[in-house]
Amino acid sequence: MLALVLLLQTGVAQPTARFDGGTFDPLVERGILEGAYPGAALVVGRRDRVLFAHGYGHLTWSASSPRVDPESTLYDLASLTKVIATTTSLMLLVDRGTVQLDAPVAAYVPEFDGPGTAGITVRHLLAHTSGLRADLPDAELKALRDSGALMRRVLGETPRVPPGRRVIYSDLNAIMLGEVVQRASSEPLDVFAARELFAPLGLRETRFRPPIRIRARIAPTGVWRGHAVAGVVNDASAFKLGGVSGNAGLFAGALDVARFAQFMLREGALPDGRQLVRAETVREFLKRAAAPERGTGAEARALGWQAVPTGETVSSAGTLLGPRSFGHTGWTGTSLWIDPDRNLFVVLLTNRAFAPRARRSFTALKTVRGQIADAAARASDAR
């Protein structure tokens, strides 16, 4: 297992305000003890270094299954796909002038010009203000024969409210964004992202549709006929689309997600200082694009990213991250939060979706996420 990477300095910081196991171990292990997830990988750091990295528990509830390692254990990132692959691919295309944020989506996907959708822009999709419904219900998905039928259904959607009116967090927005990437770049999202983003960033453990040969080190997210299912995307829409979709399908290790977080903290710069994306383009994507309506419980949004306040009673971002913080979570049990004012990121990957023992595993995980974010903020402030 990868050794902990600790950056401890002399001083008077309290034990609860340090980047070490004394701070983080009880929080992550509590989630395992409560049955929210069988294992987890946590990485905390800054734009130029990792401050803490550790794996907890096992890939399944069996103690005989492999232990989690923050470098080699891969997780189904679920909706973290939206920000790591889809949003950032759009950021690259916008930066190059290939895609315009305020252009209608129909400029890139001509079929998306039905009643109500012709006025939806790329910015609307990224901010989740398109007015499209949240997703396709399971029964509706099952009735669709194949990926082509699913895309035709999405292309034929009618907004529930006029574009730009309010935030409706929607997988359909991300599916359409993946289609925009494919049409604008003339290649599938996974191919474009692998060459233009993952390779330059050195994300060697980040990919769609992981090969069978590495499935033994992928955290499972389901059970089929008594066997753990690993390496197959958990999201039903992404599965129907063949494992590559703008809303889900990406697999990665925690340290790769950390490298991506560092790229965002560097405002689009590679480790050697070269700009993969211009800083002004990154800043445009991180501006607050939509605020929650009072009383709706919806979250604030940047372009592609969740922002603070999150609109949650129990926030996955905790209570201490700065006002410019941005992040995202994934249904399978993944999360990433970045605080540019503190030069701080927190990556927590779990496989909560795998046979959780807790009755309310999602709520339990949100509590753990928030506590870890707050602990990281306190540790950062104490230095």
Language model segments and positions:
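Short, surface-exposed beta-strand/loop micro-motifs that present aromatic residues
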Residues: 249, 325-326, 332-345
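Active-site SXXK
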Residues: 22-29, 42, 48, 76-102, ...
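Generic C-terminus detector
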Residues: 354-379
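Short, conserved catalytic-motif segment at the N-terminal edge
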Residues: 17-75, 98-100, 235, 357-362
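Short, surface-exposed loop or secondary-structure junction motifs
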Residues: 115-324
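Short active-site loop at a secondary-structure junction
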Residues: 33-43, 63-124, 161-173, 245-248
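Structural recognition of the beta-strand scaffold that forms the well-ordered cores
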Residues: 41-43, 51-53, 76, 124-126, ...
